[in-house]
Amino acid sequence: STDTMPAANTNAEFTLMCFGERLDFSVYDQSCFTILYFGTSFSQAALFNTAMELLTEIQQITAGMHLLLNASFSGKGLQYLVDTASRIFGNPIYVVDLQNKYLAISAGIVPDNDFFREESKSGYISKQGIASIRANHLDEMVRKYNHPYYYTSELVHTGMLVDAIHIQNIEVGHVMLLESEHPFEDYVPDFFH
C-alpha cells in the first residue's frame, strides 16, 4: 500500500509493487529502488494473484526451454524434438520442408480432423492444403513478419502458428503449431519462435 512506503533514501535495490492513493512519486526519482504503481483499483490480494500468475508463467517457460534445449542436443533427431515440443505446448506440431513434405508430425496428440488424418497418411501437404496456403499468402506472411504468424485455416477450422525454419540463415521449411487441444497463451508465439 502507498501508506507504507519506504524512505526515499533507502539504500537497497529492489522493486516495490504498490497500490492505493497516488503519491508524489517524484521524491523517489533518485532512489535505488524501482516503484511499480498499480493505482487504487488493485487490492493486495489482486496484486499477489497477478504476480503469482506471472511468476508461474515464467517458470513454465523456463522449464519448457530447458526441456527443448535438452531435446535439441540429445542426438535423438527431429522427431524427438517435435514430440517434446508438442508435449510442452499441449498441441500438435507439424514440420514440412519447402517441397511440402512432412518431415515430422508430433506423436500422441492427433487432431480429430479428416483433413489432417489424410495428409498424415500421404506424408505431403495435399493439393487442397497447398491451394489454401497460396490463396492466403501464408509463406509470404511468415517471411514478412520473421515471427510466428497466426493463421486460421478454413480447412481445419482452427488456428495455428506458422514459423519458418532457418539453418545458417537459409529457409529450409516451416513448423506449424495447431491450436486444437489448448488455446494459446500470450507467451506462446515468442516461445514457439
Go through each PLM region and give its residues.
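Alpha-helical/coil-rich non-catalytic "connector" segments in signaling and regulatory proteins
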Residues: 1-193
